[in-house]
Amino acid sequence: MARTQVLAALLTALIAAPLAGCASFTREDFTADQAYRAVPPTAADIRFDAADEAAALAFTNRTRRQLAANGDRRVDILAVSGGGADGAYGAGVMVGWTKAKTRPTFEVVTGVSTGALIAPFAFLGPHWDKTLADAYAGGKASQVLKGRGLGVVFSSSLYSPEHLRGLVETYCTPVMLHEIAQEHAKGRRLLIATTNLDSQQTVVWDMGAIASRGGPDSLKLFRDVLVASAAIPGVFPPVIIPIGDADGHKIDEMHVDGGVTAPFVSIPEGLYFWEAAEGPILRGRIFVLVNGKLDPSFAVVRGRAPTILGRSFDTMMKTTLRAHISANRAFAERNNMDFEIAEVPREAESNSLNFDPESMRRLFKLGEDNAVAGAAWKAPD
């Protein structure tokens, strides 16, 4: 389905929303102070706000110490961006990278939105490539955008979460969590970003720490975070994550697509201006896999609301992506780290909301071929 069709339906739903008279679910009111006090101390082991410099630095230092203790002298970071169906390109790049025999074993892998769905496979390595290819090029993603019909005016989203959650549950299994927990014990980290819509903060989740807790609650939270990170607001419903109690109130948080606040996360926002102290540090490389196109493209925009809305959204996302690329590149240069990006080629036909199986297979094959040929990665201009 084309982006303009989705946005046209979303615009119709927005116009009709005041007529609905009720929402799809209600929540109890609470204050920012209650939300803060409800978070249990143990939550610091599995999540932090990306803008919280102290929390981000504490997490970074713990990870560096454990990696150094395990003999790692270089830290390779892979950040996988959002991009919807264009994630097929990124999935293809990962598989092609394996075939080229140049794919690193990443110490840190992060994901946002569709990148959150790719990240666990990228983290676990080449023996999961076949499953990753099946997820993005096997046709299962084509049912993700399943409409609600007229019920959308009474709902929190345009599309049902049923197929998105089903996709996550199909591939995110206890076996996957067990392997992630094993790698976490070695000091490697798998991080997924969501947006806490109540606090307007990017929340970074340590998925290896969640997996290491074990049990059904761990599996549920792991899946909830993945679904939340991919839940484009208005397109898919938000994910409600219970947190704790404060003043006798049950406190929960509303989480949506991590791309609302960050198109990708290689360096948490709170560390953008941080510089490593003098002395021996671990060398590092940052790879940003962009499931989309960075460069502006010219088009005569027609005077229809969905077209204008779609073009504006696309422009905003590209501008935000380029700003984040610049900030992360500057961080890498200050801290003596290599920095490379991969993106969907300008000439490729792609659409982040086109989950047509043939289109996704073509995009996957393009990413795979480019990686095999050594043409996928480059230093930013």
Task: Label the model's feature ranges.
Residues 1-10:
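Bacterial N-terminal signal peptides that target proteins for export
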Residues 18-21:
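C-terminal motif of bacterial Sec signal peptides marking the signal peptidase cleavage site
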Residues 118-121:
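Hydrolases whose catalytic domains are alpha/beta-hydrolase-1, hotdog thioesterase
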Residues 84, 112-113:
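Catalytic nucleophile serine of serine hydrolases
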Residues 23-107, 123-381:
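Patatin-like phospholipase
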